[in-house]
Amino acid sequence: MARYRQPERLTRTISCSDDYVDLKPVNEQPSDKMDPNLGLIASMPKVDQEDRSDLQRRWRNLTKLKPGLSEVNELDNESTPAVLIFGGINTARPTDYLNSASMFLYHLDRNNWNFYGTMLEPRNYHAAAYFHGKVYLFGGYNPLHCIKGKMQATSTTFQLTLDVKQWRRRADMPSARAHHGVTIMDERIFVFGGKDSNGNIIASVEMYEPELDQWTSLASIPEPLMGSAVTNNEGLIYVVGGLTTKKEKNQEGVLSNKIYCFDPLNNKWYRKPPLPCPRAFASATTQNKKIWIWGGASLSEGGTLASTTSVDIWDPKKGRFEQHLIFDSPKHCLAVTKAGTQVFIIGGMSSKENSSLAEVQVYDRKRDILQKCAFLPVSLTGTAAVGIPVNRSPASDITTSKTTRSGSRKTQKTLKDKQQSDIHARNKAARTIQLNYRKYHASKQRRSGIPRDALRKKINVGEGDRVSGRIRTYITGYRPKAPGDDDLSKDFAPVTIPFWPPDPDTSDSVFHTVVDQFHCAKEKMQFKHFYTIPRQIDPNLGMLLFMDEDYQHSKKVLGLRNVESTPYYMSRFHATGDIQDTSIPVIIAIGGVDPQDPMNVSYGRSVFQYHPLKDRWEFFGFMSLPRNHHAAAYYRGAIYVTGGCDPHIRCWGEMVATKMTFVYRLSSNKWTRVADMHSARSHHSMVVFNDSIYVIGGRDDSGRLSASVESYVPALDEWNQEKPMPLPRMGMAVVSHGGYLWVMGGVTSTKGGNINPPVLDDVICYDPVFKHWVSGKPLRIARAFGSAVVCDDKIWLCGGAAPSQDENNYLVSIPAIDVYDNEALEWIQKATLSCPRHSSVVVALESCLYLIGGINSHELSAINRNELYTTDSDTVQSIRELPVQLTGMAAVTIPPTCVTFRSESLSIMIRHKVVT
């Protein structure tokens, strides 16, 4: 589990990264020229304890703030998001303490503000954060507590549980502060800088863990800052601009144009390219992995604060600024929050109006425009705002606590995977484990008295003895194993087979066994020879080999028949009658095989349905025949399944590819066999392009790799030959993008006795219109049996297997998610899966990528763990597991019968469901 490094508690000296020298806070306040209130609040009266108690008592029983403003007690956000603001101060009436204690609720569909009640204490220039159904308020000024006419910063933390509308005080911050910045990342809340109760600008950084109600001090900002804009982007936190102090004493505060970047995982600070001009008291948000800086204040010619109308966008990758929007009126100290597809800009100060503002503007991210909406009930500056998402689950505190702990464990695991993202180190560890296992297996054979060389010698076989079809290993003593008490759902337990999985035969385990193993589909062969696949390029890692004779012999001895029965896991499923949902897209997973139970053909016929918003797998039914390592595609109300291996058909201990094509039409709810392909194939790819379905490459029924490409026209029910690939390959990833069929990676055959692993890193593109192949940008690393999908007009390549560097060149699963940058024309690693996998399936649902099943070479088994990667937030989350460990599946996305939700709304709902 990744942990944040907890530094020593800092007092006076501010530590920073090696790029900066240590600074010390200066015990002087900025002059009035740098006052964010523009000097409008010169002095505040002192309120004694009795008056404070009386005010707070009256506020608790308050039902109406002013005439014409209704009070609500419910969020009423079942259909649209809501915006909730807390406190603030009116510069024209700063002693109206009720304004600083009030909460206002805005409904997007009604375009009006309502009074939502009062807080425990009045606050202004504080910070707020929404987290798992609760709102947290941090610090700020309390206008009821003043010393020498100045409001005092506080260190209190308040929690509002929205379900029951209940306030609770939580652990205080180590430092009192106001004008500070807050952001949420990785289930934690980070607080940066501010101004303390002594009037000093501070640089301290503190982290709050809501689950533990605990504060931790982190590495301080390289210089003291207040009024900075804070946001996070791709695992880093950015602190933009602000008001700081000079290192020399008796100097006024100055505006900063610096951008600091904080890495919470390593507890380090870095400097980024500065702002074009100094700016403070702005707000920042992250949209499309770019940082938006809203408003703020710069220096006028007279040296005072001047509000700005600019909304700038900063690209962290390119370090480039551009002005994107302009406000109607300049403003600073504004509150900015995101709610759904909109960004709300609320209140603030204006140097032009010389007063606080009641103006509220909304930025529509889809239409890229600024609009005005209902004004605040009162002009406010220094307020805090949060966006409340749609359909927030009304769970109890206990359920929320459990969900938070579960989400925390997932996030900590994701952090650990990001910290250990070195693929080569993982491959080295996997090779060490596998090498030790093989040594142990060889020593076990020596102890058993069977020399390794005896496997290649001719031996005498008795009448009742059997010989394995490929390795010629003398095997005896097969008998059924009695079922245990904990596994009564199966009639028969797996057969115990000594020395399984076996080591590859040295005479057949080199790559020259697949030299030129491809042919044209029209080629006439006088005899048919089956080429077994070397274990070094076998996606199943040898776990499915050499089972044919054992299975048939056990079946004959036991007198078994082919009986179609309901799988044992059916009792754990919710029944589903329709394969298509009315309002939400669903994922359909078809077939597959469990390497640890390869004789269970019910897995290959099973059809599962996954509902994204329910995060639940349901058993839909069976397809006509069992299949694994096949391909599927959805086209105009029908699911097409091509090729794949049939567990009933084996040759030399391996399942054989088929050429059959099945279609499931949603209108008739029936499986139908249509025209067969010209070539049998498995481990191939299938994609839809311009009213045709294309199948590419794979391994044919003779065990040879294929370079053929075929296209199927559903309207004519016929297959046509296309121009073959330059090289035969299987296990490649294929997508349709930009008018081309992109073929990425895969495994090819070797020539001339070359022992290098035949895993490819090249990318070739096929033009179906002009019938020619062109070369693309090679992959970042060579990989095979990966999965690719197009999402947000980009190609995403997930998982796969890379060749190892030992003498046997075994395949090793990798956890990388790569994306093709259309501008830079290169492949970039974007994320790391928590579980390395290959031979898995990936489907795209709006901005969400679902990775299902596959094989993990580190565990030497198939996996049932599934993961969700969101492209817009760049996060990896675990989702509901499959009922069994499966690999070689195929999956498609079925659209709803009626489109109800917008794509972005659906993505937000999915992320909210997974996190909560």
Swiss-Prot record:
Residues 414-425 have a biased composition (Basic and acidic residues). SMART domains: Kelch. It holds the Pfam family Kelch_KLHDC2_KLHL20_DRC7. Kelch repeats lie at residues 82-133, 134-187, 188-235, 237-289, 291-341, 342-390, 586-637, 638-691, 692-739, 741-793, 795-847, 849-896. Keywords: Kelch repeat, Repeat. The keyword Protein transport does not apply. Sperm. Residues 393-426 are annotated as: Disordered. The keyword Repeat applies. InterPro entries: Kelch-typ_b-propeller (IPR015915), Kelch_1 (IPR006652). May have an enzymatic role. Found the acrosomal vesicle at the anterior of sperm but not in the acrosomal process. This is Beta-scruin. It comes from Limulus polyphemus.
